[in-house]
Curated annotation (Swiss-Prot):
Gene3D superfamilies: HUPs, Isoleucyl-tRNA Synthetase, Domain 1, Methionyl-tRNA synthetase, Zn-domain, Nucleic acid-binding proteins. Keywords: Aminoacyl-tRNA synthetase, ATP-binding, Cytoplasm, Ligase, Metal-binding, Nucleotide-binding, Protein biosynthesis, RNA-binding, tRNA-binding, Zinc. This is Methionine--tRNA ligase. It comes from Aeromonas hydrophila subsp. hydrophila (strain ATCC 7966 / DSM 30187 / BCRC 13018 / CCUG 14551 / JCM 1027 / KCTC 2358 / NCIMB 9240 / NCTC 8049). Its cofactor is Zn(2+). Zn(2+) binds at residues 146, 149, 159, 162. Pfam families: Anticodon_3, tRNA-synt_1g, tRNA_bind. Is required not only for elongation of protein synthesis but also for the initiation of all mRNA translation through initiator tRNA(fMet) aminoacylation. Its EC number is 6.1.1.10.
Length: 677
């Protein structure tokens, strides 16, 4: 156990709740989980939390496309995300959502403190506005021609072709990505977080706290030199998020409440556990440690805005912001068409999660380098290291111990110096884990595995087994081999927890960091069972093919048309239909109902009888255009008393509503009063 136990809160960046987890996401979550599991092995108290980032325009619009509420969509996505993380053995203590009571309360608290401290400013700004959808357009929801290189179909904040950044208003021929309409400029009052007030404090914190990697600190210096700007934290309705207190129709920008989601998830955990004090972790003078694991694409928010918000609101700042690079596959950006944009669930359907955990660990360091998942190297390395070196070390010794000695290890360690060398390596491996130099830790472990296998090769227990009177030597050699395997598995336990569990079952012992100081002697192990399977190249091919199928499903034409929006009702009997008396009617007179937004009053001739009907078609027809037309009405509908008069039937019309309504018009030759069958 650690001599000085530490108290830590560890977070991963919050996945956005409008899509699936993929292997790019998994890099960060595996990296953080390995570090957390190592710290727990050392006896430290660690709380590991995450949540879904569940607010914003993209979620609102996608939910509309799916025909469900945003709440329904984010609930379904959260369930999927949590299943994926569980599948990769990510050991979260809590997984929550930014769309929660805890996050609302904390966002309002932090905003209130910033506002009271003079850190919130307001001013009127002009933004692009979609006149058809009646909504302001975020940068990524405007497309047009790049003002610099003239490439078409570029987003409103930067050009994918030339890399230029610009304002949406600078786009040439901008179009709304929501409706296709040409946006107009419209004024709106917005609230801003006054980041420049924190510039001096930020510069000192970046260089003096040790919280930021050197590469990131150098990048932040560039941001300081270009000048910090006030940060717009407002979005206008319609928007899915939290309304700003005292500002109806104004909402917190998703990036304001997203990092507060770390606090909210931890608060939710505290409410569940009752033995954890929230304030002791988040008060300004907290002695607990706070670690964020994030990707380099969101470093700007986590290294500038987030610590400044915490400082302005009187909360503690991160101990360390650990930034990592992107994942590439086979040396290139993940590609859906090539099948290398691999969802976590697709991977889990084909391969062992421990394989990816090991491969990522073997390539991860503390820098912001991109990591390439080379699938050929992935197969070769996992099979060579985990199967051939590690698992084989156990299997080639366990058989002799089981068959010849009933699973009993020797009473003493025959190679105390060799064992001590392995056990003493934990200092260097611990330093590598602590500093997130996982690739260095794996190199150290695999170098030991090579040495252990050389020992077995040199001793050749399969030869000793054939020699008469050599049982003691055979037991001694194989016991050393199994003990060296035990040390290696203890070192790999943070990386491959499931393999470690299976190894523990074989060893009949829980693997611990300090427990490996002494070897297992006079100890009975369980019968050996296969611990791990080789990766077959065919499984890689199947996974890639399945990823292409995922793309095909995404690209399949979405069903559209009236039946999608308004499905056919339940089946009725012929007798039910026969009860409805439909008649041709002549519209003799039509007039607007001044007190009603949607109604026209119609006088209908149905062949010797006149009926008065109020019809909700005012949005689609001028009264004078209807007079003299034939239509169809339900003639035997019970009269309905309305405040404008009695309605004596119903006119039939097709369409979703608004301007899109069309009354039924019988062809020439039909006469008022004729039954429609």
């Amino acid at each position: 156990m650690a001599t000085d136990p530490r108290t830590m809160l560890v977070t991963c960046a919050l996945p956005y709740a409008n899509g699936s987890i993929h292997l790019g996401h998994m890099l960060e979550h595996i990296q953080a989980d390995i570090w957390v599991r190592y710290q727990r092995m050392r006896g430290h108290q660690v709380h590991f939390v995450c949540a879904d980032d569940a607010h914003g325009t993209p979620i609102m619009l996608k939910a509309q496309q799916l025909g469900i509420t945003p709440e329904e969509m984010i609930a379904a996505v959260s369930k999927e995300h949590q299943a994926d993380f569980a599948g990769f053995n990510i050991s979260f203590d809590n997984y929550h959502s930014t769309h929660s009571d805890e996050n609302r309360e904390l966002a309002e608290l932090i905003y209130g403190r910033l506002q009271a401290g003079g850190k919130i400013k307001s001013r009127t700004i002009s933004q692009l506005f979609d006149p058809e959808k009646s909504m302001f357009l975020p940068d990524r929801f405007v497309k047009g021609t790049c003002p610099k290189c003239k490439s078409p179909e570029q987003y409103g904040d930067n050009c994918d072709s030339c890399g230029a950044t610009y304002s949406p208003t600078e786009l040439i021929d901008p179009k709304s990505a929501v409706s296709g309409a040409t946006p107009v400029m419209k004024d709106s009052e917005h609230f801003f977080f006054d980041l420049p007030q924190f510039e001096k404090w930020l510069a000192e914190w970046v260089r003096g706290s040790g919280a930021i990697q050197e590469e990131m600190a150098n990048k932040m210096q560039e941001w300081f030199e270009s000048g910090l700007q006030q940060w717009d934290i407002t979005r206008d309705a319609p928007y899915f998020g939290f309304e700003i207190p005292g500002a109806p129709g104004k909402y917190f920008y998703v990036w304001l409440d997203a990092p507060i989601g770390y606090m909210a998830s931890f608060k939710n955990l505290c409410n569940k556990r009752r033995d954890i004090d929230f304030d002791s972790y988040w008060k300004a003078d907290s002695e607990a440690e706070l670690y964020h694991f994030i990707g380099k694409d969101i470093a700007y928010f986590h290294c500038l805005f987030w610590p400044s918000m915490l400082e302005g609101a009187g909360f503690r700042k991160p101990t360390k912001v650990n930034v990592h690079g992107y994942v590439t596959v086979n040396g290139a950006k993940m590609s859906k068409s090539k099948g290398t944009f691999i969802k976590a669930s697709t991977y889990l359907n084909h391969l062992d999660p421990e394989c990816l955990r090991y491969y990522y660990a073997a390539k991860l360091n503390s820098r912001i380098d991109d990591l390439d998942l080379n699938l050929d190297d992935f197969v070769a390395r996992v099979n060579a290291d985990v199967v051939n070196k590690l698992v084989n070390l156990a299997s080639r010794n366990a058989g002799f111990i089981a068959k010849r000695f009933d699973g009993k290890l020797a009473a003493t360690c025959a190679e105390p110096e060799l064992y001590a060398e392995f056990a003493n390596s934990r200092t260097a491996i611990a330093e590598a884990y602590e500093s997130r130099e996982f690739s260095r830790a794996i190199r150290e472990i695999m170098a030991l595995a090579d040495k252990a296998n050389r020992y077995v090769d040199d001793k050749a227990p399969w030869v000793i087994a054939k020699q008469e009177g050599a049982d003691a030597e055979l037991q001694a050699v194989c016991s050393v081999g199994i003990n060296l395997f035990r040390v290696l598995m203890a070192y790999l336990k943070p990386v491959m927890p499931l393999l470690a569990e299976r190894a523990e079952a074989f060893l009949a012992e829980t693997l611990s960091w300090d427990g490996i100081e002494m070897p297992l002697v006079d100890h009975t192990v369980a019968p050996f069972k296969a611990l791990f399977s080789r990766i077959e190249p065919a499984k890689i091919e199947a996974m890639i093919d399945a990823s292409k199928e995922d793309l095909a499903k995404e690209q399949a034409p979405k069903a559209s048309g009236p039946l999608v929006d308004d499905p056919i009702s339940e089946t009725i009997s012929y007798d039910d239909f026969a009860k409805i008396d439909l008649r041709v009617a002549l519209i003799k007179k039509a007039e607007a109902v001044p007190e009603a937004d949607k109604l026209l009053k119609l006088q209908l001739d149905i062949g010797g009888e006149t009926r008065q009907v109020f019809a909700g078609i005012k949005s689609a027809y001028n009264p004078e255009d209807l007079e003299g037309k034939l239509t169809v009405m339900v003639a035997n509908l019970a009269p309905r008393k309305m405040r404008f008069g009695m309605s004596e039937g119903m006119v039939l019309a097709a369409g979703p509503g608004g301007k899109d309504l069309w009354i039924l018009e019988p062809q020439e030759g039909a006469k008022p009063g004729m039954r429609v069958k």
